[in-house]
Amino acid sequence: MFLLLQLTLRQDEQGLAIDLFEQQDLNVDRSGRGSRSRFIENLRKHCGSEDGVIIRAGSSTDVTVGDIRATVGPVRLFSVDGGHTEMLTANDLALAAGALAEGGIVILDDHFNPYWPDVAAGLGRHIFVDRSPLRPFAITPGKVFLCAPEWSETWRDALIKAFPTAHEKHSEMYGAPVEILGLGRFSLRSEADRHVSQLKAYVKTRPALAAFARKVTGREE
């Protein structure tokens, strides 16, 4: 995601990458294995060079909103894909919310990933406990997009106009209107149906589990 965001930079802007990289002793949930050299290699390969990117190695818990604003100014697009615990996710979302420019967008990764349920808990904490100024406005495969409520309609309309064939439905999340978009062959509805089919097939191969499922649902099939 960072590489894509880097390609959207204006001439007077810089990107800021914050990652543990080789400091894996700080990776409390083992959610990634960063490599600074590989990151720079990918920047050179896909973005031309690492020029225009400020790289900070370390934990985001040691970063403040003031640090971010002093380094790159108000942020238009902020990707949250760091630690995957509830508290780390909430921390990173708070940094993003505080660093955003007017009309800025936060992109949260892995919210619906069943392997990382604490990411969803972190967003819930950020919104309801930390009283976030942000709300979701769009969902795509693997990601939730957030902005200030007064910008929601603007960005939802822009997404629908930009990707009319990807738009699947309108819904709500945490009381806020959201647009659901698939990407290419990744239709969220078809993905959900596929997972249900896989689950049913798995349950049928486990008689005890199948019996439990029938008891819980009251269904014989």
Regions found by a protein language model. Give the residues of each.
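S-adenosylmethionine/decaboxylated-SAM
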Residues: M1-G218
